[in-house]
Structures are given as structure tokens and as C-alpha cells.
């Protein structure tokens, strides 16, 4: 029989070993009826020919076939019939969906017949080549690579925690780092080239829960860096308000040789209420001490005084510094500004903490100083004791062989005040103080505030050069084109020479107290330098960041590594930058292990309706210090039900904030021993366990707290509910007597248990 139909040709091509061009006659062992045969004329090349390879071996009587790899057929040709019925069409579609690509079955049931050689392929022990399909076309491989690239990109996006992670991964961590301030997790990540997530994970394993924007102190920074093999060098320097650095970097000046003698700048320092302002009142013939709120100075005040010596007038600039402990930065600033210092010590009070602090500031700044012992007109004053106390702080009077003049004075009667002024001028002459008025102006901001009529206003002490109207100044991140200059006598002037204290208008914003003011050539240059300085956080911003969200290792140890849930949020408006700095310095002294302090905003200016809205949104306490209310503020406060606290004395403000923090504390108790007893026997009464005890020390009280101790371990702590002697209820049992104790929630009494009775006394709430 000649096989010349298309079905058999394709079927044979899949199961035979070779295809030859010659015709072959095959005997069919299992003939089957073939349906739907369509005859067509074909060439000899299309005929199926089976030709056994003569070279194949016949080992063991088994016949091995060598199959040639069939050409890949189009999916459409899986149905070999040109004429389809509905059933065959559906079957082909189902097969295409299954996509069976792993193995070719010779006896596939999708054909309409069985090949006679199918038995051979089934019984053959081995086939010469694999029956697996050939590899897929390259197009499909390209698709796979493309999809892999997409998945890689997706993984990168998922893993990257921030935009700088790629740079962090590419940069190797440094061997050591230097820190000067507390850092946020983000800043630390950039500094040590370690991803934020790795830092947070490490701290979490240490039971320290932080966020990326949270500030951590040097102790935690050192712990993190040590974990990643990085050494830490702490260079936390005392804040001198940027004086030295700004002066060193001032390139607006040049040497001209036109130096002239300038008046000395004298700072008056000392403990609160020791008579600093009273002394200056006497010198200036004024009465500022009685005008000050609370009787204390709360800002640096600058005065120009003319001292007449032997018919010669000599100008002296005095700086009056606050003596309250909150104004440490102001005293430090005064010590750095001054040419000569006066340290006031009250004869009836002696050396106090702020006295010692002032001495340290002056000695560190290497400034000559005079000790003035005030209030010698009071009874009981003893200057010799004060001189002896000063020896502890390396201050030796001229009388004892030292170099520090000590002058007893009375600011009320004026006793020895002239001698004090003469001593100051002599020390100033020894310093040979000079300045060049031909240079551009250079000075320092003593105070600054926002005036509702004139805008930002600053008090400037000119140290060198001359300041003119229309000069361009750069003051930190602020700049100015001077519109008005007002001298110490409240007069408008056109220029100010060295050692002058003036008020200036025309600033772009309120500058920070202690900032250096430099005159530059043009308005454009001033703006550019101000923009450069904007990127550097001011001292006030640094202090606020360090105060807010502050976390230390000590804090976490004291709170058993629990998150601090108690928090007070504050919005504070002050009268000037100096007050702002003083308040932040005071608040930073409060420990935050128990209550977190969060300063949402602190700045000079009036209290406005916007502040009220912010307080309502952030659930903050709105506080004012020596400031006023803008129009509409009180109405907004009443509408939002926001209480505004306004203070005029700084220590009242600080104490009130401290009290608010303490009110949030949970009560703490101390245990006061009352008595001791021992369980002699245990008996039951109406299904209740009663401990028969003998009081061995002091007494037992009904409703008192007790600890039940067994084998030196506390097994129960609670209150005595019932205390009986025989059958009688009693309030207390004295030592040497027996009693019965019942506690409903404790029934596990045993003979020999020790009972320690105590009272819980509430402790005074404290943040420390």
C-alpha cells in the first residue's frame, strides 16, 4: 500500500528516523480506518520514506532507531486536516492553552490513528537522541531578559529608603567622624555612609525606638558608629555665639594704618540682685533699676557715658548683663565683647553661682577685670571674707600680692565709684585700644526685635570702621540697607564711629543676637552672602533642634526603654532674640526622661491669630514673654478656646513650664516600714484561709500595705483587709501579740511566712 496522504506523512515524520526521497512499501500490522481523507498530488520529496540505518547495531536482539530532529511546526498545523469539524476545532484550542512543551508523545491521542512503529518506540530500551523539544526561539529569551530588567528596577525602588541611598552604597564608611552637635538619624546616615534603615534597625535591636527625623545625642551616635566600626571624636565646643569664627572669616577689611584711639567697652557682670544696674544708674544719673520688671535685668543694655578726669572727657561704653542663671549666653557674649570687665559681688551675700560663672567667662576670654564689692553701706558686710573666697577661683587681690583690683563701693552713696572708673580707664590704657574709622563698618548685634512700626530693628555695637546711612550690611542670614541710625541719646544720626552703640533700621529679617555685622560694597553682595549663611543653622535653631525630640541613652535606661508618651508642646513669642536664647537655654536644662518637651515654635514678635491657630492645630500651649497681642488675637483665642499665658519675668515662665511638666508625672511613693510579723499557723474558717500571726516588731495596722516573704522572695504584696484579735476586729496589733490576718485575694499562707508592713508616702514630683 502506498502511503501518500498528508496525515500519515506528518505522523511518520515525527516517529521515523530518517527521511529519504525514495518510495517505501510498509506492511501495516494494525490497520485502522482513516476518516476524512483528502487526496492530493505530491512530489516525491514529500513522501514519507523509512530507511533503517544499516550501520546501527543490533545488540541483544533489540532494534534501536535514530530519530532525526523534526522541523518546528507552526501551532496552526497541529490540526492536520484542512476540513475541520466543530469538535476538532475545540480540541485544538484547548491544547494550545495547555502549552505542553516538555515532551513529544509518539502515541499522542490527538491523532486519528496509531502508527505501527509506535510499539517499537515504546519497547526500545534507549533512544539515540532526546525526545525533548528544541530550544525556544531567541525572541522569547529577549522577552525574559526584558522582564528581568523590569523586576530588577522594581526591586531597587522597593529597597531604596531615600534619594541618597545610592550614594551611601557607593561610598565606603569613613574610619572616623567628628561630631559637634546632636544629629538626626538622616544626618548621621549621610555622615557615616550607612543607610537610615540599618541605623534604625540596630537601635531597635537595642530596644531604642527612633524615627529618621529624631535627634540623638553623642552617646547614641557613638554606639551606632562603634557598631559599624567607625571611631567617633566628640568636639562639642562651648557656644561663643560665633564671635571668633565670624571675626576670623571677615574678609571685608583691609589694613590702612589709619588707627585712632577708641573708647573702652566695659561689661558689668555678677549674680542676680547684687547691684549691677544700680551702679550704672549712679554713673549715668538715672533710675533704671526701679523701672525694671521684677527688679532684675533681662537683656543686655548698652550705655555710653562720659567720664571727666582732670578736665578731660573720656567716653566709656557700658554693657549691663543679666545676672539670672537663665542668661548664661548673654554673660558669655558680654565677656567676649568687652575690653574690661567689672564683676559685682554683694558684701552681704558673698560669692554666688553666677559670680563664679562670670569669673570663668572672663578668665576664658583673657580679659582684664575689676572686682567691685557692692553694698558696703549695709550692716554686717565683710570684704575680707569675700577676698578669701575668691582665692578658690584663682582671683588674688592686689593687697594679697595678686593683680586683680578689688574695690569696695556703695552705689547708693557713690563711695569709691570714682576710684572704680579711674581703675577702668587705667586698664583700658594698658590695652592700647585702637580702631580704624576709614574701614567699612564691623560690629556685633547686642539685641534685635521685630517692631510693628519699623520692622526688624537691631542694636549694634560698632567695633571697627564707620557706619553710614545707605550702607549695605550682611548679618548672618539677614541683610540690610541702612535707613535710620539712632544713637544712645535717641537721636537720628548720619554715621556712627567705633565703640558706638546704635539702633539700626532697614533689615530684611530679625538677626540672631551675637551675629557679626559686616559692611559690604553692594546690595547684591549682601544678599548673596546672606543666602550662603542661610544654609547654616543659627545657634537658636540648633538649640531648638537639640531640645526637641531629644533622646539619650540615660533617658532610655531611666524609662526601661519605653517610648516617652507624655509630652508638652509649646509655642513661645518673645520680645527679642536674647530672651529667645535665654528661654531655650533654661528649657534645655530640664531632663526629658519622664516628660518630653517639644518647642513647636519660638521667635521674637507679637502674638498673632496665626499663632493661636497653630496652637489649636498642634495642641500646644501658647506663651508670651514681654510681648504684645496683635489685633484680632484675643478674639481668635476666645473662639478657639486657647489660653494665652503672658509673662514678664523669665524665672516665672520657666517655673510654670516646669510645673506643667511635673503635673503630667505619675505619682511615686516611698515605703516607710511600720512593723513585722511571722505566720505561726494557718487555719480555715468558712472556706477562707486565715493566717495566725505573731507581731515581732513594732505593730501591724489594718488596711496597711504588707509584703509576704517566703524564702527571701516576695510572693505577695497588698493590703490587710481584716485584722482580728481572738474574735474581735481591731485596727492595730502591737508587738508581742498574736492576731489573725485575712486577705481575700491571697490564700496561700504557710507557716513561717514573714510579713513586712509599710506605709506608702507620696514623693514630691520631680523631673530629675
Swiss-Prot record:
User: Could you tell me which residues belong to the region Disordered?
Assistant: 1-20, 54-77, 155-176
Q: Alphabetically list the UniProt keywords.
A: Chloroplast, GTP-binding, Initiation factor, Nucleotide-binding, Plastid, Protein biosynthesis
Q: Where is the tr-type G domain?
A: 261-434
Bias (Polar residues) ranges: 160-176
Q: Name one GO molecular function term.
A: GTP binding
**Binding positions for GTP per the UniProt entry:** 270-277, 320-324, 374-377
- Fetch the InterPro entries from UniProt: EF-G-like_DII (IPR053905), IF2_II (IPR044145), IF2_N (IPR006847), P-loop_NTPase (IPR027417), Small_GTP-bd (IPR005225), T_Tr_GTP-bd_dom (IPR000795), TF_IF2_bacterial-like (IPR000178), TIF_IF2 (IPR015760)
Cross-referenced Gene3D superfamilies, in alphabetical order? P-loop containing nucleotide triphosphate hydrolases, Translation factors, Translation initiation factor IF- 2, domain 3
Any single GO CC term annotated in Swiss-Prot or TrEMBL for this entry: chloroplast
Q: Enumerate composition-biased segments (Basic and acidic residues).
A: 54-65
Intracellular or extracellular location(s): Plastid, Chloroplast
Family under the similarity heading? Belongs to the TRAFAC class translation factor GTPase superfamily. Classic translation factor GTPase family. IF-2 subfamily.
Q: Which PANTHER family match?
A: TR-TYPE G DOMAIN-CONTAINING PROTEIN (PTHR43381:SF5), TRANSLATION INITIATION FACTOR IF-2-RELATED (PTHR43381)
NCBIfam families reported in the protein's UniProt record: IF-2, small_GTP
- Cited function: One of the essential components for the initiation of protein synthesis. Protects formylmethionyl-tRNA from spontaneous hydrolysis and promotes its binding to the 30S ribosomal subunits. Also involved in the hydrolysis of GTP during the formation of the 70S ribosomal complex.
Q: What is this protein called?
A: Translation initiation factor IF-2, chloroplastic
Amino acid at each position: 500500500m502506498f502511503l501518500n496522504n498528508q496525515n500519515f506523512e506528518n505522523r511518520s515524520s515525527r516517529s521515523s528516523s530518517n527521511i529519504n526521497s525514495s518510495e517505501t512499501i510498509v506492511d501495516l500490522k494494525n490497520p485502522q480506518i482513516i476518516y476524512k481523507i483528502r487526496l492530493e498530488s505530491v512530489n516525491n520529496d514529500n513522501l514519507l520514506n523509512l530507511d533503517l540505518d544499516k550501520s546501527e547495531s543490533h545488540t541483544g536482539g533489540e532494534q534501536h532507531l535514530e530519530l532525526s530532529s523534526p522541523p518546528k511546526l507552526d501551532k496552526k498545523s497541529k490540526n492536520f486536516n484542512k476540513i475541520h469539524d466543530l469538535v476538532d476545532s475545540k480540541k485544538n484550542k484547548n491544547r494550545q492553552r495547555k502549552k505542553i512543551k516538555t515532551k513529544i508523545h509518539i502515541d499522542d491521542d490527538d491523532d486519528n490513528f496509531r502508527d505501527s512503529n509506535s510499539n517499537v518506540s515504546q519497547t526500545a530500551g534507549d533512544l539515540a537522541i532526546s525526545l525533548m523539544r528544541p530550544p525556544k526561539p531567541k525572541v522569547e529569551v529577549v522577552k525574559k531578559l526584558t522582564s528581568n530588567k523590569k523586576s530588577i528596577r522594581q526591586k531597587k525602588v522597593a529597597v531604596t529608603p531615600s534619594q541618597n541611598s545610592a550614594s551611601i552604597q557607593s561610598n565606603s564608611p569613613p574610619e572616623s567622624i567628628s561630631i559637634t552637635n546632636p544629629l538626626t538619624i538622616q544626618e548621621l546616615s549621610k555622615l557615616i555612609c550607612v543607610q537610615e534603615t540599618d541605623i534604625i534597625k540596630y537601635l531597635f535591636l537595642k530596644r531604642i525606638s527612633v524615627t529618621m527625623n529624631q535627634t540623638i545625642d553623642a552617646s547614641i551616635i557613638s554606639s551606632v558608629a562603634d557598631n559599624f566600626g567607625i571611631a567617633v571624636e566628640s568636639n562639642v565646643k562651648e557656644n561663643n555665639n560665633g564671635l571668633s569664627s565670624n571675626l576670623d572669616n571677615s574678609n571685608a577689611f583691609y589694613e590702612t594704618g589709619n588707627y585712632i584711639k577708641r573708647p573702652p567697652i566695659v561689661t558689668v557682670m555678677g549674680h542676680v540682685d547684687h547691684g549691677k544696674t544700680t551702679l550704672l544708674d549712679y554713673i549715668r544719673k538715672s533710675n533704671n533699676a526701679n523701672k525694671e520688671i521684677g527688679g532684675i535685668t533681662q537683656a543686655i543694655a548698652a550705655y555710653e557715658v562720659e567720664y571727666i578726669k582732670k578736665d578731660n572727657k573720656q567716653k566709656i561704653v557700658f554693657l549691663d548683663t543679666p545676672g539670672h542663671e537663665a542668661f548664661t549666653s548673654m554673660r558669655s557674649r558680654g565677656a567676649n565683647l568687652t575690653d574690661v570687665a567689672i564683676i559685682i559681688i554683694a558684701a552681704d551675700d558673698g560669692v554666688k553661682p553666677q559670680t563664679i560663672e562670670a569669673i570663668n567667662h572672663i578668665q576664658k576670654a583673657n580679659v582684664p577685670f575689676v572686682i567691685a564689692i557692692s553694698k558696703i553701706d549695709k550692716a554686717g558686710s565683710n570684704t575680707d571674707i569675700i577676698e578669701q573666697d575668691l582665692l578658690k577661683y584663682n582671683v588674688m587681690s592686689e593687697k594679697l600680692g595678686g593683680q586683680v583690683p578689688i574695690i569696695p563701693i556703695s552705689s547708693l552713696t557713690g563711695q569709691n565709684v570714682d576710684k572704680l572708673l579711674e581703675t577702668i580707664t587705667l586698664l583700658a590704657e594698658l590695652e592700647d585700644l585702637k580702631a580704624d574709622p576709614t574701614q567699612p563698618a564691623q560690629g556685633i548685634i547686642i539685641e534685635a526685635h521685630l517692631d510693628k512700626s519699623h520692622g526688624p530693628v537691631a542694636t549694634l555695637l560698632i567695633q571697627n570702621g564707620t557706619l553710614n546711612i545707605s550702607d549695605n550690611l550682611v548679618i548672618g542670614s539677614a541683610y540690610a540697607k541702612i535707613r535710620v541710625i539712632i544713637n544712645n541719646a535717641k537721636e537720628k544720626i548720619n554715621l556712627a564711629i567705633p565703640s558706638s552703640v546704635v539702633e539700626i533700621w532697614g533689615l530684611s529679617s530679625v538677626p540672631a543676637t551675637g551675629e557679626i555685622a559686616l559692611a559690604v560694597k553692594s546690595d547684591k553682595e549682601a544678599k548673596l552672602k546672606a543666602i550662603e549663611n542661610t544654609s547654616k543653622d543659627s545657634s537658636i535653631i540648633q538649640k531648638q533642634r537639640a531640645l526637641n525630640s531629644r533622646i539619650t541613652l540615660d533617658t532610655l535606661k531611666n524609662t526601661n526603654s519605653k517610648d516617652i508618651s507624655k509630652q508638652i508642646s509649646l509655642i513661645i513669642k518673645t520680645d527679642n532674640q536674647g530672651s529667645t536664647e535665654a528661654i531655650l537655654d533654661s528649657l534645655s536644662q530640664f531632663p526629658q526622661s519622664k516628660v518630653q518637651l517639644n518647642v513647636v515654635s519660638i521667635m521674637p514678635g507679637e502674638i498673632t491669630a496665626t499663632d493661636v491657630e497653630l496652637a489649636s492645630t498642634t495642641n500646644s500651649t501658647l506663651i508670651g514673654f514681654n510681648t504684645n497681642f496683635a489685633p484680632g488675637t484675643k478674639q481668635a483665642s476666645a473662639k478657639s478656646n486657647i489660653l494665652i499665658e503672658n509673662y514678664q519675668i523669665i524665672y516665672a515662665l520657666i517655673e510654670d513650664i516646669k510645673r506643667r511638666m511635673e503635673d503630667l508625672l505619675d505619682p511615686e511613693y516611698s515605703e516607710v516600714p511600720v512593723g513585722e510579723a511571722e505566720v505561726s499557723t494557718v487555719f480555715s474558717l468558712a472556706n477562707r484561709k486565715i493566717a495566725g500571726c505573731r507581731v515581732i516588731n513594732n505593730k501591724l495596722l489594718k488596711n496597711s500595705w504588707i509584703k509576704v516573704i517566703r524564702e527571701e522572695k516576695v510572693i505577695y504584696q497588698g493590703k490587710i483587709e481584716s485584722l482580728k484579735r481572738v474574735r474581735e476586729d481591731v485596727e492595730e496589733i502591737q508587738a508581742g501579740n498574736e492576731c489573725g490576718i485575712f486577705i481575700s485575694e491571697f490564700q496561700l499562707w504557710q507557716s513561717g511566712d514573714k510579713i513586712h508592713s509599710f506605709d506608702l508616702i507620696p514623693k514630691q514630683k520631680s523631673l530629675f
